[in-house]
């Protein structure tokens, strides 16, 4: 009995302790909620902006996505395809392997005095480099409607290669008069290589589908040369030469069959083949470590071939597979890339960038790419080309809307994958049970609101329970025995 009395004496103290705990808990909740409200009301963001405006730039978009970039080093591709670059605005080069190449010079000084080109005699003597000659043939065959042989002169004595194209388009009138000739075609091909910065189309002049190109140079001279460090103005890239090949529709049927030889191989972080992403190794990048992209990003290249970065991945893959499987020589490698180009790269993308360059719109030079990195999960987007305008890369602010859209796409993709994951891990029976229980609850709420009556009352009389009256107001027990009294339903 004494223990019971003692317990009840301690009850007020226990209640006081409980009240203290409740007050502490409520205080903590109020403080945390207040801090959250202050953080999300925009005050701190406004103060941060006012403090950093004009001083600092952020590379974080949508709070979690960091803007990253990579620069591709395409010098390793010279094992299987020609690379082109520029020393200045007038001297341009095509590299074949590491030992030889071609020099293409826009000049006002003539190198060859005669006006003829005896190709048949050169073929009989067979003294020139066949690899270099195949590149020249590609360049020459890319000239639209070549039928003006007087505009071309050649010299193959002693195994050297010297070809001179005469240009006479220094004025707008000359450009219009010679529109569609071989000289104009040479300039058009040169522009397709994204080289001729001193070539322009006056007032958008065009006749019969040909752009009338104007230049201040009189000659284009092509010569073989030893390979040195010529690329001082631009980095070596295969895209100029491949842009010529992509215009040759007659190669398409041959090239489509070649893709069975090569597979879309993916590599893990150690370089081992693994179908779970693609890693750009150090030799593929400029001043950067290995960069890996997940299956989500790379899979888009297999689904739709409409990104410049996908073209570069295919070129790297082609280069690796050609060296590993075929061990091709120089001349054979040129022939191979000539046939495979339409299966590796999207010629519509190349033409679109070429037209952008002509019209002065920012275009892609296939060298620098940007992508978004999710700081929470480490996932990356598929890199997109960093556009070039007037010889320099655009500032980030010029394509901030594209960055925002890519961040939104990544958020949408994340939500979709999360939904699919949850759908795959949740048993179907459990989902059915949830739907049934929810429906049952809603029906029960409706039934509760309408208050269904349960028994009869005599009008003006108290509740007859436990007696159950029939429609005549009579109960069989005999207590309610007067029939005909008015009744009503009650709950």
UniProtKB/Swiss-Prot annotation:
Keywords: Disulfide bond, Fusion of virus membrane with host endosomal membrane, Fusion of virus membrane with host membrane, Glycoprotein, Host cell membrane, Host endoplasmic reticulum, Host Golgi apparatus, Host membrane, Host-virus interaction, Lipoprotein, Membrane, Metal-binding, Myristate, Transmembrane, Transmembrane helix, Viral attachment to host cell, Viral envelope protein, Viral penetration into host cytoplasm, Virion, Virus endocytosis by host, Virus entry into host cell, Zinc. Signal peptide: none annotated. GO terms for molecular function: metal ion binding. Glycans are attached at residues 78, 88, 98, 108, 118, 166, 224, 365, 373, 390, 395. Residues 2-17, 59-432 are extracellular. The record marks 58-59, 259-260 as: Cleavage. A lipid is attached at residue 2 (N-myristoyl glycine). Disulfide bonds join 85-231, 117-154, 179-212, 279-292, 301-310, 364-385. Residues 34-58, 454-491 are cytoplasmic. Zn(2+) 1 binds at residues 57, 467, 475, 477. The record marks 33 as: Important for GP-C-mediated membrane fusion. The chain crosses the membrane at residues 18-33, 433-453. GO terms for cellular component: host cell endoplasmic reticulum membrane; host cell Golgi membrane; host cell plasma membrane; membrane; viral envelope; virion membrane. Zn(2+) 2 binds at residues 455, 457, 463. One of its GO terms (biological process) is virion attachment to host cell. Belongs to the arenaviridae GPC protein family. This is Pre-glycoprotein polyprotein GP complex. It comes from Mobala mammarenavirus (isolate Rat/Central African Republic/Acar 3080/1983) (MOBV).
């Amino acid at each position: 009995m004494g223990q019971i009395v003692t317990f009840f004496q301690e009850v007020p103290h226990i209640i006081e302790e409980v009240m203290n705990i409740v007050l502490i808990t409520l205080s903590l909740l109020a403080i945390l909620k207040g801090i959250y409200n202050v953080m999300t009301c925009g005050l701190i963001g406004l103060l941060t902006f006012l403090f950093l405006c004009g001083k600092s730039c952020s590379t974080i978009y949508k709070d979690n996505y960091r803007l990253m970039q990579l620069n591709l080093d395409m010098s390793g591709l010279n094992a299987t395809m020609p690379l082109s670059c520029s020393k200045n605005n007038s001297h341009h080069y095509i590299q074949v392997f590491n030992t030889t190449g071609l020099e293409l010079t826009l000049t006002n000084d003539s190198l060859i005095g005669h006006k003829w080109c005896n190709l048949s005699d050169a073929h009989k003597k067979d003294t020139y480099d066949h690899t270099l000659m195949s590149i020249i043939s590609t360049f020459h065959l890319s000239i639209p409607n070549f039928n003006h042989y007087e505009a071309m002169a050649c010299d193959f004595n002693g195994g050297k290669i010297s070809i001179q194209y005469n240009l006479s388009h220094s004025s707008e009138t000359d450009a219009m008069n010679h529109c569609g000739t071989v000289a104009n075609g040479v300039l058009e091909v040169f522009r397709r290589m994204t080289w001729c910065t001193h070539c322009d189309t006056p007032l958008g002049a065009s006749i019969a589908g040909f752009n009338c190109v104007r230049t201040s140079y009189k000659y284009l001279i092509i010569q073989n040369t030893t390979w040195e460090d010529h690329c001082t103005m631009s980095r070596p890239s295969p895209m100029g030469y491949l842009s010529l090949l992509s215009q040759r529709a007659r190669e398409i049927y041959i090239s489509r069959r070649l893709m069975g030889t090569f597979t879309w191989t993916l590599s893990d972080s150690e370089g081992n083949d693994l179908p779970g992403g693609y890693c750009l190794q150090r030799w593929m990048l400029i001043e950067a470590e290995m960069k890996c992209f997940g299956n989500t990003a790379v899979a888009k290249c297999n689904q739709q071939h409409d990104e410049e970065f996908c073209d570069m991945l295919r070129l790297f893959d082609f280069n690796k597979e050609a060296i590993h499987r075929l061990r091709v020589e120089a001349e054979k490698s040129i022939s191979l890339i000539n046939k495979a180009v339409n299966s590796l790269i999207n010629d519509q993308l190349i033409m679109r960038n070429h037209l952008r360059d002509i019209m002065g719109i920012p275009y892609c030079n296939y060298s620098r790419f940007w992508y978004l990195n999710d700081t929470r999960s480490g996932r990356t987007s598929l890199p997109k080309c960093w556009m070039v305008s007037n010889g320099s890369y655009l500032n980030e602010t010029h394509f901030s809307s594209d960055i925002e859209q890519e961040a939104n796409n990544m958020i949408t993709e994340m939500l979709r994958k999360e939904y699919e994951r949850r759908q795959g891990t949740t048993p179907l029976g459990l989902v059915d049970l949830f739907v049934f229980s929810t429906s049952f609850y809603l029906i029960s709420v409706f039934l509760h609101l309408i208050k269904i009556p349960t028994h009869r009352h005599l009008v003006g009389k108290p509740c007859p329970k436990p007696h159950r009256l029939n429609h005549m107001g009579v109960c069989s027990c005999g207590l309610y025995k007067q029939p005909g009294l008015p009744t009503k339903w009650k709950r």
